[in-house]
Amino acid sequence: MSEETTVRPERTERSERPERPQYRGNGPRKRRPFQRRKVCRFCADKDLVIDYKDPRVLRSFITERGKIVPRRISGNCSKHQREITEAIKRARNIALIPIASTHVVA
């Protein structure tokens, strides 16, 4: 077998390369503005307690449709998000919080 060498074309300088378009798809790329990381309000304020008997605190973690707000939106840490979920489910079970928005009497 004879040794074959592959000849690669010489690399061009950056300035000589054709420019790539700065967009993909239909329009220019949109950059998201920097968003500040949300802080768990229960970790920040140690006096605030998660209790299933306090529906005022729990309502801020429920959407208008009665769904539990996810952690990435509420800004809670995983420990407190689990506690909030459990407290909301307990409060729903004993009818302190409505299960869905259709159960709310206006």
Curated annotation (Swiss-Prot):
Mitochondrion as UniProt keyword: no
Family according to the record: Belongs to the bacterial ribosomal protein bS18 family.
GO BP field: translation
GO molecular function: small ribosomal subunit rRNA binding; structural constituent of ribosome
Subunit structure: Part of the 30S ribosomal subunit. Forms a tight heterodimer with protein bS6.
Composition bias type Basic and acidic residues, residue spans: 1-22
Region (Disordered): 1-34
Role summary: Binds as a heterodimer with protein bS6 to the central domain of the 16S rRNA, where it helps stabilize the platform of the 30S subunit.
Organism: Geobacter metallireducens (strain ATCC 53774 / DSM 7210 / GS-15)
Protein name as annotated: Small ribosomal subunit protein bS18
